[in-house]
Amino acid sequence: IDLGSGTLTVKVFKAGSTATGKNNNFEVLGTNMTTALATRSATIAAINLNTAGADQDQAILAPHLDSGQTAWTGVKWGTENQVEWEALVRTSSAIDNQKVWAGLKLTNDQLPQTDADQAYFYFSTDATNGQNFDDFTPWYFIYSVNGTDYLTNTGITVAASTNYHFKISIDSDRKPSIFVNGRQYSVTQTAITAFDGSTEVSGTTQATIATSYSATNANTQKGAAMKNDIDLIPYIGIEAGDGAAASIDVSYSTISRLLFE
């Protein structure tokens, strides 16, 4: 009720929609995840996502997937729409035994081999229930084009209690560019054999890209063109790799696109 104007405003929520009392646009998902495990941080401007405390428990932030609930789902974020997504996440004080992912996918699964088309940032401390990398310390950028997989090693070593501002920008040619904390990083155009979980894979480093691309434009190479007309969904998630709860803070997630393709 607006006492100044005497106006009574009533909002009607869609029947069956999840957790609309908390947030009209987002919900939390994942193995053993509940709304009680998503809380406002007492120390920083963020939502704290905690896993429930068992191995492979997950905490995933997603747009409400109910039809008609939010523009985050009602609007299509297609690869042909010049989509730009960004978010700010903060790692916890303990970054062992966990997997973190943030970006654009078809499903909320952290496994790279699940989605044939995707573009997201990924960190994993080990290969258990995940992908086997030759190096488990950096942020990777993973994107897939109709089942062909690309893996970029950003060279950024993931640190505890640290803010990471991620941005993915897909241009009019459907080529992705990536930014971390305001700095652009090159994206490989060289495909790996495939993600299968067990086979060890190596991400193309920034130095390798610069050598084959241009040392004077070492951080500006875009990725290969993504498949046309693929509608992606923004997800941010964390999965515990042992019996201890894992957590991550999310300050914001934003997305935009061309009004008409």
Positions of the model-derived regions?
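Short carbohydrate-recognition loop motifs
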Residues: 36-60
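Secretory/extracellular carbohydrate-interaction modules
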Residues: 51-138
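Short, aromatic/His-centered strand-loop micro-motif at the edge of beta-sheets
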Residues: 142-165
